[in-house]
Amino acid sequence: MKINFFIKLGFLILFTSKIIGQNNSNGLVSGNIQTIGQYYQEDTIINAALPEHLYGFNGFANINYQKGDFRAGIRYESYLNTLEGYPSTFSGTGIGYRYISWNSDNVGVTVGNFYDQFGSGMIFRAYEERQLGIDNSLDGIRIKYEPFKGFNLKGMIGKQRHRFEDGLINGNGIVRAIDGELNINELFDSTNYWKLKATLGGSFVSKFNTDNNTTLFNMPKNVGASSIRLNLRYKKLRFSGEYV
């Protein structure tokens, strides 16, 4: 039943994209579908445990809409049953990712789910690695602002994805983060011709969580982390450093 849904959805995406794509004034719809199925057989040589369901299925369908500076999208996910090796917290079928965003020349706003990373990702990284079953997207609000050329600010607040049970379920912790990055070469026109390229950045991330306390430890409810970073490039030489 779920496989038939994905097949019908695929034809709908292709058909809609073809029609709307001919008239850009109405916007553009795009999408893709990925399905992964596994059939398990008993291996008497290595005595591997055989799951009761015998067949695993993971399915993903993305639908995105874009018109000018506005974008929106959803991702429908299905785990019936979850592939072996995937986290046991992935089960059922439903919406696992949805967002709307608006971007102009120097301002960008995203509401819903999004992925992002500060610097090397040591203090904040929200990303998806589907083959490993990793998805810790942030569900909240993100604002990007470029007050002047070469200087970018980014602030966000939200909850991270924790598990999937017939839909997205976030963790209880609230993430609050801000990041700034200064491109020296873009800041001053005279430095655009320098062979040395330099970028400075700084980040601060805090998390509020009331679930940390146990009978053995009384953990703080607010935990913060900060970092500064420097990226240098000279011809084929590159240097990246971050202090946390």
Can you say where each PLM-predicted feature lies in the sequence?
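Surface-exposed extracellular loop regions of Gram-negative outer-membrane beta-barrel proteins
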Residues: 115-126, 131
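Phosphate/ribose-recognition catalytic cores of enzymes acting on nucleotide-derived substrates
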Residues: 97
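Bacterial Sec-dependent N-terminal signal peptides
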Residues: 1-30
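Signature for the C-terminal beta-barrel architecture of outer-membrane proteins
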Residues: 23-56, 65-66, 71-72, 76-91, ...
